[in-house]
Amino acid sequence: MFTLPQKEFRMTTACPGSDSIQDLPSNKGDGLERECSRKPDQKLLKFYGVGDPAAELSSSSPYLSSRGSVIKWFWDSAEEGYRTYHMDEYDEDKNPSGIINLGTSENKLCFDLLSRRLSQSDMLQVEPALLQYPDWRGHLFLREEVARFLSFYCRSPAPLKPENVVVLNGCASLFSALATVLCEAGEAFLIPAPYYGAITQHVYLYGNVRLVCVYLDSEVTGLETRPFQLTVEKLEMALQGANSEGVKVKGLILINPQNPLGDIYSPGELQEYLEFAKRHELHVMVDEVYMLSVFEESAGYRSVLSLERLPDPQRTHVMWATSKDFGMSGLRFGTLYTENWAVATAVASLCRYHGLSGLVQYQMAQLLRDHDWINQVYLPENHARLKAAHTYVSEDLRALGIPFVSRGAGFFIWVDLRKYLPEATFEEEVLLWRRFLENKVLLSFGKAFECKEPGWFRLVFSDKTHRLHLGMQRVRQVLEGQPQLADGAPPHQIQEPQGPHR
């Protein structure tokens, strides 16, 4: 049960079962991809009674409310690795022995292209309207461009409508806003796990909403299955488990392409998940923040907005942002597309606290309307660089005999290091993570994504070759000094793009 922190709960050695409700927020990150960093000897705080002001913290401040203490606890529990990295960040000239960051999912490959485009004269206009309060949904000129952009790149059957667009400062705010307007305090969303762990905080810190994990595993049971595959049967089991524990589930979160797996849901799978949600009157939030970062054409990505007929359009809400696809995680632009006017209006009300400046809105409109630059310059070069970086890292992993999951989308490879754990526990996983950090390379460990199998790590490859080379060299040094179990993972767990999987 996902509840408020209480004192002195030590890390468990195994995840709950496949229909369990999330029990640990262990190191979920702070919404800026810092999900890989809790101290291994830090005691976890037992969660109980979501929203219960009587919940106790092992260390609370006399200056904070109980809610404030919980919020501070999330920050404190997820900062160590990221803070360590920033105190000793690698710099080729100033700090060549510093930490290489292969843990934060950012695209660092195309700054040259972005810098030139964002510095052009058409980006620098200032008008009185841009310095005044906007429509909180976003300026109409931006919402019109977002609708045209999504219509084109999501391949929607009919043009999308600007009145269904809401603009916020990133997908973290969108998750938070949707959780707040769709759920009562203590209600929950289903989410396939492993998943991007910062979503835990996005839906909880304001909305007081839980996550019910639909736990996936690496086992492959036949020719038509793949590692960590989501099925309707698993969704049904998780929903039944939540109901049996008295937890009201209001929605389903899907990330497509998936983070941390890099997996892609086929149109048939998406249709099945949406029909499951309709049967149970669940909202579906689809995060498509990596939709233009599919660098293998054979991966066969399709947006949910490309489906001819949504089973329940009033409960289907789609998110996208520029942080990943355009390498602008510091610029903070995200958008919601929903046909539900009540949901759009409620989320827009929260844009008072999560809106964009008029100048940023203008720049985003200019960028999104420039299809010539996007199609002829940026996307081809970005995909080529992502593919080259992925090839470099995957070849290193093969040389080390390390299985991995990767389907040609996103910035990361899901790496199987289970054979390097003396015991199959999350304590050993964190100890291995710390050895990487001590050897000046930062990765993200599986428990940060609520993976139920100890020993999986997310490795980000979307960086320059010289940093990848040094980072992989440091990974190799750690693993070569680590004893291995006699039997590694079976070869069928290596999953790479070889054509559509459906």
UniProtKB/Swiss-Prot annotation:
<feature type="binding site">
    <location>
        <position position="106"/>
    </location>
    <ligand>
        <name>substrate</name>
    </ligand>
</feature>
<dbReference type="InterPro" id="IPR015422">
    <property type="entry name" value="PyrdxlP-dep_Trfase_small"/>
</dbReference>
<comment type="similarity">
    <text>Belongs to the class-I pyridoxal-phosphate-dependent aminotransferase family.</text>
</comment>
<dbReference type="GO" id="GO:0006520">
    <property type="term" value="P:amino acid metabolic process"/>
</dbReference>
<dbReference type="GO" id="GO:0030170">
    <property type="term" value="F:pyridoxal phosphate binding"/>
</dbReference>
<protein>
    <recommendedName>
        <fullName>1-aminocyclopropane-1-carboxylate synthase-like protein 1</fullName>
    </recommendedName>
</protein>
<dbReference type="GO" id="GO:0008483">
    <property type="term" value="F:transaminase activity"/>
</dbReference>
<comment type="function">
    <text>Does not catalyze the synthesis of 1-aminocyclopropane-1-carboxylate but is capable of catalyzing the deamination of L-vinylglycine.</text>
</comment>
<dbReference type="InterPro" id="IPR015424">
    <property type="entry name" value="PyrdxlP-dep_Trfase"/>
</dbReference>
<feature type="region of interest" description="Disordered">
    <location>
        <begin position="15"/>
        <end position="35"/>
    </location>
</feature>
<feature type="modified residue" description="N6-(pyridoxal phosphate)lysine">
    <location>
        <position position="324"/>
    </location>
</feature>
<dbReference type="Pfam" id="PF00155">
    <property type="entry name" value="Aminotran_1_2"/>
</dbReference>
<dbReference type="InterPro" id="IPR015421">
    <property type="entry name" value="PyrdxlP-dep_Trfase_major"/>
</dbReference>
<dbReference type="InterPro" id="IPR004839">
    <property type="entry name" value="Aminotransferase_I/II_large"/>
</dbReference>
<keyword id="KW-0663">Pyridoxal phosphate</keyword>
<dbReference type="InterPro" id="IPR050478">
    <property type="entry name" value="Ethylene_sulfur-biosynth"/>
</dbReference>
<dbReference type="GO" id="GO:0009058">
    <property type="term" value="P:biosynthetic process"/>
</dbReference>
